[in-house]
From Swiss-Prot:
GO molecular function, one term: DNA-binding transcription factor activity
Protein name in UniProt: Anaerobic nitric oxide reductase transcription regulator NorR
Pathway the protein takes part in: Nitrogen metabolism; nitric oxide reduction
Record-linked PANTHER family: ANAEROBIC NITRIC OXIDE REDUCTASE TRANSCRIPTION REGULATOR NORR, TRANSCRIPTIONAL REGULATORY PROTEIN
Upper taxonomic lineage: Bacteria, Pseudomonadati, Pseudomonadota, Gammaproteobacteria, Enterobacterales
Record: residues binding ATP: 215-222, 278-287
Protein's GO biological process: phosphorelay signal transduction system
SUPFAM superfamilies xrefs: GAF domain-like (SSF55781), Homeodomain-like (SSF46689), P-loop containing nucleoside triphosphate hydrolases (SSF52540)
InterPro entries per UniProt: AAA+_ATPase, GAF, GAF-like_dom_sf, Homeodomain-like_sf, NorR, P-loop_NTPase, Sigma_54_int, Sigma_54_int_dom_ATP-bd_1
Pfam family, one: Sigma54_activat
Gene: norR
Organism, as annotated: Salmonella paratyphi B (strain ATCC BAA-1250 / SPB7)
Length: 506
């Protein structure tokens, strides 16, 4: 069997029929799998010494979420280095990255593999991988025929990446015009909710508008901020991060605007604040709703006039900073309650974005699980970490109140448990390895909350009571210290000091 002109023409026609790049990629690998009668095919994009799956056929869905580093996958490294068709014999010593990831064949290892590196000029932009359980499956196809397939795939991928680059406004005035692959943002997901979010990010990234990013705790608001910065003209300058919830009131102004020597006790030298550090770049203010009203007023002035004053200095400094802010609060309600300035809210929310909770993202759960499985595999030096069909169903049926962060922790914990019960360096995650509960923050009973040991003196009893109150407040507020301080009706700086004295933090 060999490729006829009709077969190659059919592949080219399928590429043109697709609606959008993703559809074309899927048509390409599905057609190739049919033509070559193989068990699995995948189109991968190359970036920063790793391969990122764009489309798959015949492989487990979580493959789309995995990131295959060259260091962790010697076969893919061989493909990247070869510059031509690479055939791996059935008895190859190099492990296949898809072992255990072909549905229905989880316990079997791939026997035949062909790798086709894809180039745009001299630049490696991706690879096409073809796998079969039959050792001699690809012997009937010549290298020249496979090179023709690679050329078709490379053309489709190169055009798609170039168009994506132009649409994202990464080809800015004054740039060299040379093709450069877009950086990976780790925003994994193909659900309608995530697709819409990515489109909105592309729209706003190239502008200079301030952006307010909303969403529940653990949804990935910081990744959204990174994607906006990365797609903006400011990407060559720094993205500076500040968690407003972790700022004691006494140092918050200095952290934001800097201070001069002698401004206060301990100010032994001049110090730049976050706004100065982010000059000509982007400042990401996480948990913006935790700022005091006094600091909100000073932040508003910077947004209005573009100048700052260091603490202890009468002079103003001009800064050119784009502000991205994130919160898990409903700032409209905070405005109505008098805890957030309405004028600052309107300044920040010129282009609001909402990061969907994981429970609304459908099969993205499996893609993200694949990503975290691959991370664990590399970190623990395992040959493979895969999800059983039962584990996939279990993850899809769970509500994920803690969102992506909870999923990450659940995968890491499951890998450790599975590794402890299985010899060797291959881990299969089963349903029983996940101890998932919708009651992430159980309400304590009055008895357990107020119970004190009977044999304590007054001081020890008081400290135990304080310790328990702080623990409960942190649990009920997602370990947010500022929110816990409000719940306990105390200053956040005092809460930090008390927690340290009680041994609750270092």
């Amino acid at each position: 069997m060999s490729f006829s002109v009709e077969v190659l023409a059919g592949i080219a026609i399928e590429l043109q029929r697709g609606i959008g790049h993703q559809d074309r990629f899927q048509r390409l690998i599905t057609t190739l799998r049919q033509v070559l009668a193989c068990d699995a095919s995948a189109l991968l994009r190359y970036e920063s010494r790793q391969f990122i799956p764009l489309a798959i056929d015949g492989l487990a869905q979580d493959v789309l979420g995995r990131r295959f580093t060259l260091e962790g996958h010697p076969r893919l490294e061989a493909i990247a280095r070869a510059g031509d068709v690479v055939r791996f014999p059935a008895d190859s010593d190099l492990p296949d990255p898809y072992d255990g990831l072909i549905p229905g064949q989880e316990s079997l290892k791939v026997h035949a593999c062909v790798g086709l590196p894809l180039f745009a000029g001299q630049n490696l932009i991706g690879a096409l991988t073809l796998d079969a359980m039959t050792p001699e499956q690809f012997e009937v196809f010549s290298d020249e025929e496979l090179r023709l397939v690679a050329a078709l795939a490379a053309g489709a991928l190169s055009n798609a990446l170039l168009i994506e680059q132009l649409e994202s406004q990464n080809m800015l005035p004054g740039s060299s015009g040379v093709f450069e692959p877009i950086k990976e943002t780790h925003m994994i997901g193909l659900s309608p909710a995530m697709t819409q979010l990515k489109k909105e990010i592309e729209i706003v990234a190239g502008s200079d508008l301030n952006v307010l990013i909303g969403g529940e705790t653990g949804t990935g608001k910081e990744l959204v901020a990174k994607a906006i910065h990365q797609g903006s003209p400011r990407a060559v300058n720094p993205l500076v991060y500040l968690n407003c919830a972790a700022l004691p009131e006494s140092v918050a102004e200095s952290e934001l605007f800097g201070h001069v020597k002698g401004a206060f006790t301990g100010a032994i030298s001049n110090r730049s604040g976050k706004f100065e550090m982010a000059d000509n770049g982007t400042l990401f203010l996480d948990e913006i709703g935790e700022l005091s009203l006094a600091l909100q007023a000073k932040l508003l002035r910077v947004l209005q006039y573009g100048d700052i004053q260091r603490v202890g200095d009468d002079r103003s400094l001009r800064v050119d900073v784009r502000v991205l802010a994130a919160t898990n609060r409903d700032l409209r309600e905070e405005v109505l309650a008098g805890r957030f300035r309405a004028d600052l809210f309107h300044r920040l929310s010129v282009f609001p974005l909402f990061v969907p909770p994981l429970r609304e993202r459908g099969d993205d759960v499996v893609l993200l699980a694949g990503y975290f499985c691959e991370q664990c595999r590399l970190r623990l030096g395992l040959s493979r970490v895969v999800l059983s069909p039962g584990a996939r169903r279990h993850l899809l049926n769970y509500g994920w109140p803690g969102n992506v962060r909870e999923l990450e922790h659940a995968i890491h914990r499951a890998v450790v448990l599975a590794r402890a019960t299985r010899a060797g360096d291959e881990v299969v995650l089963e349903e029983q390895h996940f101890a998932l509960s919708e009651d992430v923050l159980p309400a304590p009973s009055a008895e357990s909350f107020l119970a004190l040991p009977a044999c304590r003196n007054l001081r020890e009893s008081t400290e135990n009571f304080q310790r328990e109150m702080i623990r409960q407040a942190l649990a009920q507020n997602n370990h947010n210290w500022a929110a816990s301080a409000r719940a306990l009706e105390t200053d956040v700086a005092n809460l930090h000091r008390l927690a340290k004295r009680l041994g609750l933090k270092d």
